């Protein structure tokens, strides 16, 4: 329970900030394959927190790929409160791509599409050139099938 994490202190736990940054990084990497790769967090390489966040604070996460090879993908990330740098984090992600995971789906495409639409990922996510990311066609088809649109 968060209440027992630091009794008598009200702040946003750093572990939850790392979780939010990791989810942002996972979405970035997933988007590169139109969300067909099975991307998982493998390691928190480093993290530095400059100050605590408190209830009502809005943190903005920025994630950038720094290295991608056959072993995994490294990302560098920051958390900002307004113009202030709140945290710096380096994470490593792995892709579950060997034969043991061939029949494993981390998310059902239609439900995942609905979830990331609710999170407004396609409204705030941008490609390196600044253009908005697009909803992958296989997810649109799965979503239409789920909602019985156009049939």
Annotate each PLM feature.
Residues 25-60, 94:
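Hydrophobic beta-strand-centered segment that forms part of the acyl-chain substrate-binding groove
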Residues 87-89:
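A structural microfeature
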Residues 92-145:
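C-terminal output/interaction extensions
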């Amino acid at each position: 329970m968060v209440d027992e994490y630091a009794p008598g202190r009200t702040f946003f736990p750093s572990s939850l900030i790392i979780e939010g940054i990791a989810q942002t990084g996972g979405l970035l990497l997933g988007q590169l394959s139109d969300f067909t790769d099975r991307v998982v967090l493998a390691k928190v390489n480093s993290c530095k927190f400059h100050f605590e966040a408190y209830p009502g604070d809005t943190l903005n996460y920025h994630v950038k790929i720094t290295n991608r090879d056959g072993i995994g993908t490294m990302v560098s990330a920051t958390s900002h409160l307004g113009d202030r740098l709140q945290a710096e984090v380096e994470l490593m992600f792995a892709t579950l791509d060997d034969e043991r995971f061939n029949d494993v789906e981390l998310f059902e495409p239609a439900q995942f599409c609905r979830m990331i639409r609710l999170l407004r990922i396609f409204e705030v996510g941008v490609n390196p050139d600044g253009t908005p990311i697009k909803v992958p066609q296989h997810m649109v088809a799965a979503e239409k099938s789920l909602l019985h649109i156009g049939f």
